[in-house]
């Protein structure tokens, strides 16, 4: 998922912040925020965000377990909880999970 919020003029300074929002068994969801700043201003403006999923693998390409993530800030907690809903939606759409099993996803509509 990639969301573009604002255009970035040529010559802007970009700051890219990437944080793991949730770790599952062998996969991690990484939330990326992109901020722009002009050369003449100190003010930063969020222009883009993206969500990626990575799978940890060993030297033979087999998935391996990743450490648990414990969110600290309110934003981290919000993204942590939303990550499970995104994962369940992805699994349902891929046919790897029955919609009836996607309890966190169903909770949005209850």
Whereabouts are the PLM-identified features?
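Small beta-barrel nucleic-acid-binding modules, principally OB-folds
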Residues: 1-9
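HotDog/MaoC-like acyl-thioester-processing domains
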Residues: 9-10, 21-110
């Amino acid at each position: 998922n990639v969301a573009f919020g604002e255009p970035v003029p040529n010559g802007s300074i970009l700051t890219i912040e990437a944080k793991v929002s949730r770790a599952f068994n062998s996969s991690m969801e990484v939330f990326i925020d992109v901020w722009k700043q002009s050369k003449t201003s100190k003010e930063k403006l969020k222009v883009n965000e993206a969500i990626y999923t990575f799978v940890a693998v060993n030297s033979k390409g087999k998935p391996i377990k990743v450490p648990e993530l414990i969110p600290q800030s309110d934003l981290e907690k919000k993204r942590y909880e939303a990550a499970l809903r995104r994962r369940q939606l992805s699994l349902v759409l891929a046919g790897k999970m029955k919609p009836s099993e996607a309890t966190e996803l169903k909770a949005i509509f209850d």
